[in-house]
Design a protein with these regions (language model features):
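Cytosolic/stromal cytosol-facing helical appendages immediately following the last transmembrane segment
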Residues: 1-23, 53, 125-133, 137-208, ...
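Membrane-helix interface/capping segments
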Residues: 45-59, 257
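Alpha-helical bilayer-embedded segments of polytopic membrane proteins, i.e.
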Residues: 1-45, 64-87, 96-110, 204-249, ...
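Intramembrane catalytic core of multi-pass membrane enzymes that act on lipidic substrates
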Residues: 58-179
Length: 348
């Protein structure tokens, strides 16, 4: 029954539902839950770096409940966002309530949308990869599928990687550099993939073209089915969701670097090239994304198999608290700069 702990990841959609059903301070329910309740629970429950024996590992490989707990996020996310669009179409809100609703929807899309899409995007089954792309749609970040899988995992912890934050780089400047570079790199990688198979720019297999068709159609569908207000809200929440994603990218690799070998190539990705976190609640809610060192060490590993490595650098607090800390650059630098290995300290 240990696998059922990941049902706790559905508490974020539950908090989002409360936000969408409320007025006043209630519209901030998901925000309060994500950045007050979860950090508090991380402190109270602490860390867990337990490793599984061989029999438990084998059970986790074949037990499909881990997969279904991911799949259910798709109808949950689209169902809740549809409800939210209905609410913003039929109800009147103050400026403060609009902010609460937007942030709450952005948190839902980031945690149960982008995060789950990221996990499914590393799978081999066509249906799982398709589900991944669908979950990226409301986040307006479909190109991330290409750049992350074919770019970031190859270039992580190098100056060439847009998703690796440099030492002394603030999260706000990182938003600009990461978002712009990852988009450009996604196009570059797409053209390389097409060229490798002698396919033209207008090929059916140009996923980037499809993404630029599908995402506007999604926005248009929100306009037709709901309202202009809902359409603008959909755009705003999509942007908020991928900025939350970029906060996570920021804390996952901040200041860490791979060095070039005598051959001129970068050293192999090791467990010390990502910041790890074993805080229990953050691990569960984010489907073990916080064990990021192991994810980069072997990206084909499913979330339920990810483990902690002793040589991995560790964040002093869980992911929710780390995101908050990153939003205050002086505090982030004060806490994290001393933890970055001296030989890696190459400032932006």
């Amino acid at each position: 029954m240990k696998e059922l702990k990941y049902l706790f990841a559905y508490t974020v959609p539950m908090a989002a539902f409360v936000s969408f059903s409320s007025t006043g301070i209630g519209t901030y329910a998901a925000v309060i839950y994500a950045f007050v309740v979860l950090p508090f629970l991380d402190v109270v429950l602490g860390k867990n770096d337990t490793k599984w024996d061989e029999s438990e590992r084998k059970n986790r490989i074949v037990n499909t409940i881990f997969d279904w707990m991911l799949y259910l996020n798709l109808p949950m996310v689209f169902g809740l966002m549809s409800y939210c669009f209905f609410q913003v179409t039929t109800q009147s809100y103050t400026t403060s309530e609009w902010i609460g609703l937007s942030l709450s929807a952005g948190i839902l899309l980031a945690t149960n949308g982008i995060n789950v899409a990221h996990e499914l995007g590393h799978r081999q089954l066509f249906v799982e990869r398709t589900m991944s792309k669908i979950l990226y749609i409301p986040c307006l970040y479909m190109h991330f599928y290409i750049e992350h899988n074919f770019g970031h995992h190859m270039k992580v912890a190098t100056p060439e990687d847009g998703a690796t934050a440099k030492y002394n780089q603030s999260v706000y400047w990182f938003w600009i550099t990461s978002v712009s570079k990852q988009y450009a790199d996604a196009w570059k990688k797409q053209m390389e993939l097409l060229s490798a198979k002698n396919r033209s720019f207008f090929s059916f297999y140009n996923d980037m073209l499809w993404y630029h068709l599908i995402q506007p159609l999604y926005i248009l569908a929100v306009l037709v089915l709901f309202s202009q207000t809902a359409m603008l809200f959909a755009i705003a929440t999509g942007v908020i969701s991928f900025l939350f994603l970029e906060c996570i990218n920021y804390i996952e690799h901040y200041g860490l670097l791979r060095f070039k070998t005598d051959s001129g190539r970068y050293e192999r990705v090791q467990t010390h090239h990502s910041w790890n976190s074993n805080f229990t609640i953050g691990r569960i809610v984010l489907y073990e994304l916080t064990r990021h060192s192991d994810h980069h060490f072997k990206s084909s590993k499913k979330y339920q198999l990810l483990e902690s490595h002793k040589k991995s650098p560790h964040l002093p607090v869980g992911y929710p608290a780390s995101i908050l800390m990153s939003l205050v650059p002086p505090l982030w630098f004060f806490v994290m700069n001393p933890r970055v290995p001296t030989e890696m300290k190459q400032s932006v």
